[in-house]
A protein has these predicted regions:
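Catalytic cores of peptidoglycan-degrading enzymes
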Residues: 1-117
Length: 117
């Protein structure tokens, strides 16, 4: 279930941006999070408001972000394939409930993930 869409939004969470550069997909705590495509994990760890975050570089200027995880199952530098589990859903960082903050960065600019799914 998508609980927050890409773009401007009203949020009651202190410290949360009013421009959302991703979509939020909600499910139960611990739900498996899978890589949208194959690539190399360039970041796997804690990053402020994102909480536990995984970033995958897919090449050609294309990266995906997976934030607010409860735990991570991949490490920086690891090669992953499309559909491989990379994390477990949670509510870490600046978050109001269990969800995956899913973002797509193309050539340094976040784009609406719904245009690519």
């Amino acid at each position: 279930v998508i609980t927050s869409y890409f773009g401007r939004r009203n949020t009651g969470i202190r410290g949360a941006s009013t421009y959302h550069e991703a979509i939020d997909i909600a499910n139960s705590y611990g739900t498996a999070i899978y890589a949208a495509d194959g690539g190399t994990v360039t970041y796997s760890g804690w990053r402020g408001g994102y909480g536990y975050l995984v970033i995958i570089d897919h090449g050609n200027g294309y990266q995906t972000y997976y934030g607010h995880n409860s735990s991570l199952v991949v490490s920086t530098g690891e090669h992953v394939y499309k559909g491989q589990q990379i994390a477990r859903m949670g509510s870490t960082g600046v978050s109001s409930g269990n969800h995956c903050h899913f973002g797509i960065l193309i050539n340094g600019t976040f784009v609406n993930p719904l245009n690519y799914l």
